[in-house]
Design a protein with these regions (language model features):
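Extended, charge-rich helix/loop segments that form flexible
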Residues: 26-33, 37, 135-226
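Glycine-rich, histidine-containing beta strand-loop boundary motifs that form or position
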Residues: 80, 124-128
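C-terminal active-site subregion of NodB/CE4 polysaccharide deacetylases
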Residues: 1-99, 106, 137, 141-154, ...
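Short, well-structured alpha-helical interface segments that form or flank functional binding sites
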Residues: 64, 106, 110, 215-218
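A short acidic, amphipathic alpha-helical/loop segment
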Residues: 110-114, 219, 284-288
Length: 352
């Protein structure tokens, strides 16, 4: 089902490009700017089974987007400047802002060099447990479990279930099912228990995943001294906030900020909701982020930035630079607002 959805999106992007419809829709739906979502930036990996491919783009694709923005005379700005322009209604020039979620080491090793070429700022949203080396990027651990197994046994809703993982196709099917099940568990402790058991059964060192992929506090301290780099908060544990109590959500927000500020000795005023879609961030989370004192908070709901977003600063949409669609032809489609307009039923604001 997810592969079908991916194919449909790809076909839609190509259709917008080939028909030129994005040129017609740009004046209406491009808005005043775009906040881009990224996770990993690194060279392309080999292997047929890559269920998290959508979370990584190559340095060349990032460079292509930056070239497109510069040639289109679109300003590339920081989250601080996004906030200023929206609140002061300084919107005469279109802008783009680059945000990177989780705090992966490749943001420093690959993305920063590309951003420097264009003197382009970036904001990295850090999950504080990831920087501590105690976090659980469980979707990566799940990929590792399935990659090495010919079958996976798990108890889902009290029913013992055996999933075939002997081929790349069956691995993808199993990953999709287990990913959705794990993300939907009602509390983070349940997810921790289940992914921990899977990793133990299949000899995957879950604790090492975070340390191998994410920047430590010491690395972040050096990274954050780069003039182009901004740091935001991304919760403590990277849990699905919508599944937690008000008290837990507030603690995830404020404690993550406090830890980052203490470790890096700099203020943190921007937040990114873990997962960030409708199933993970809604009106309650938007209100709690505002109450916690964040100037802005970003979702992963697809959308361009319009002047009206100034009234919803803790519910800002983003546009994903998705590893499944690394085709330079679609870059003007992404910045035209045509794709997100169609996705949103031609609504400009989605903050409910």
């Amino acid at each position: 089902m997810k592969q079908l959805r991916s194919n449909v999106i790809r076909a839609g992007l190509e259709a917008l490009y080939l028909t030129g419809a994005h040129h017609l829709l740009r004046p209406i739906f491009a808005g005043v700017g775009t906040i881009f979502t990224l996770h990993h930036v690194r060279p392309k990996r080999s292997g047929e089974f890559q269920p998290n491919r959508h979370l990584e783009v190559t340095p060349d694709f990032l460079r292509a987007m930056l070239l497109h923005l510069r040639s289109s005379q679109i300003d590339i700005i920081s989250m601080d400047e996004v906030h200023r322009r929206l609140t002061e209604r300084s919107l005469s020039r279109r802008f783009a802002c680059f945000t990177f979620d989780d705090g992966y080491r490749d943001n420093r090793d690959y993305a920063l060099a590309v951003m420097r070429e264009f003197d382009a700022p970036l904001t990295v949203f850090v999950a504080s447990d990831f920087a501590q080396g105690t976090g659980r990027p469980w979707w990566i651990a799940l990929e590792m479990v399935i990659a090495k197994a010919s079958s996976v046994e798990v108890e889902i809703d009290g029913v013992a279930t055996r999933l075939d993982t002997s081929t790349a196709a069956s691995k993808q099917t199993a990953f999709d099912r287990l990913h959705d099940w794990l993300r939907g568990l009602p509390e983070r402790q349940n997810l921790k228990r289940e992914i921990g058991a899977l990793c133990a059964r299949h000899a995957v060192d879950e604790a090492a995943v975070c340390r191998e992929l994410c920047m430590s506090w010491e690395e972040l301290a050096l990274f954050s001294q780069e003039p182009l780099v901004g740091i935001g908060a991304h919760s403590v544990t990277h849990c699905n906030l919508a599944n937690e109590s008000d008290e837990v959500v507030s603690r995830e927000m404020t404690m993550s900020r406090a830890r980052i500020e203490s470790a890096l000795q700099r203020g943190v005023v921007h937040f990114a909701y873990p997962y960030g879609d409708r199933g993970a961030a809604g009106r309650r989370e938007f209100a709690l982020a505002k109450a916690a004192g964040f100037k802005t908070a970003v979702t992963t709901r697809p959308g361009m930035i319009f002047p009206e977003n100034a009234g919803h600063l803790t519910a800002l949409p983003r546009v994903s630079l998705n590893g499944n669609y690394q085709d330079e032809r679609i870059l003007p489609v992404l910045t035209s607002g045509a794709a997100t307009a169609m996705w949103n039923g031609f609504r400009r604001i989605d903050a409910a």
